[in-house]
A protein has these predicted regions:
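Active-site cofactor/substrate anionic-group-binding motifs, chiefly glycine-
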Residues: 45-98
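Glycine-rich phosphate/diphosphate-binding loop of Rossmann-like nucleotide-binding domains
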Residues: 51-63, 145-226
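Anion-binding alpha/beta catalytic cores of soluble intermediary-metabolism enzymes, centered on
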Residues: 93, 100-171, 266
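A short, gly/pro- and small-residue-rich
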Residues: 111-128, 236-258, 284-285
């Protein structure tokens, strides 16, 4: 694996496939035995440097470390006040002397890059404004479990072309998934990320489609994915965003354009009645809690692989 995991584009196809394979094996062992036979992370610590609050990311990382014999040390914004009380390079240099791996959930991608630049231990992007690459790994594992294979699968994303959308584009393209994105004109994914995904897709024979039409995006999809319309830090834009995104709600009418057995996916937290109807997210096609569960296992596989274990 690369030294750090900062972007979903950091992995080659064989690396991404091996990670998913390993995550699936860890999941099977954990579900079958309720424990792992080997504890390769004994005596090892993961530092969780979080500027943003978290449920899934924090618990999945901490539980994953514990299940493999290690432990997690959680540092909230108020604990270190990174960039104000202490510079980002100094935080990285200090933590490198104590811990074996670092996961950062921050506001700006540049912060993750700076941590990686000055860290002597692997750094994992646990979410930033640009990407959510651990989530994308969990999503691909979920899709693979349900569909049997990823190559040629059709994944539709509708709503805000945000960090989650970016990582899905990049990792989907890497793994041969055809990704179609339906977003309002002013909320489309970053053109640089789209161009990068298109280059990757050229090698994997996947297709990338960007449209303003939610119906066109979900046409024939194996899975339909959405996220909140206003992410953390965008709450002040809520009032202006709601009417723009209303036509992009994932509800039974929109799902009818997808395949009959299409999955519904969401990274959570969700706002029922906004980006998705309660009927869909709480219905039989929803795999949102499988995605959440899979965060645990892909992150375990990622930590082990980054540490060469």
């Amino acid at each position: 694996l690369p030294r750090h995991y900062l972007s979903a584009a950091d992995l080659t196809r064989p690396q991404a496939e091996a990670l998913l394979e390993r995550a699936a094996a860890l999941k099977a062992e954990w579900r079958g035995q309720g424990r792992h036979a080997d504890l390769p992370l004994q005596g090892k610590t993961l530092a969780l440097v979080f500027e943003k609050p978290s449920l899934r990311t924090r618990v999945a990382f901490e539980a994953g470390m514990t299940q493999l014999g290690g432990n997690g040390s959680y540092l909230a914004a108020r604990d270190i006040d990174m960039g104000t009380r202490e510079s980002v390079p100094d935080v990285a240099r200090n933590l490198s002397r104590w811990v074996q791996v670092l996961a950062a959930r921050v506001f700006r991608h540049s912060t993750v890059e700076e941590l990686a630049k000055y860290s002597d231990v692997p750094v994992i992007n646990a979410l930033c404004d640009r990407e959510h690459p651990c989530q994308a790994l969990a999503d691909m594992l979920t899709l693979r479990e349900r569909r049997g294979r990823l190559d040629g699968a059709r994944l539709a994303y509708v709503g805000d072309g945000n960090n989650v959308c970016h990582s899905l584009l990049l990792l989907g393209a890497t793994l041969g998934v055809n990704v179609s994105v339906g977003c309002p004109l002013d909320y489309q994914p970053d053109p640089e990320i789209v161009a990068q995904a298109e280059r990757i897709a050229g090698d994997s024979d996947a297709t990338i489609t960007i449209t303003q039409s939610p119906q066109e995006a979900v046409d024939g999809a194996d899975a339909v994915y959405t996220d909140v319309w206003a992410s953390m830090g965008q709450e002040h834009e809520r009032a202006q965003r709601m009417p723009v995104f209303a036509p992009y709600q994932v509800n039974p009418a929109l799902l009818r354009h997808a395949r009959e057995e299409a999955l519904f996916m969401h990274c959570l937290p969700a706002h029922r009645g906004e980006e998705v109807s309660a009927e869909v997210i709480d219905g039989p096609q929803s795999v949102v809690f499988d995605q959440a569960e899979n965060r645990l296992h892909v992150q375990k596989a990622l930590i082990l692989s980054l540490l060469g274990l």
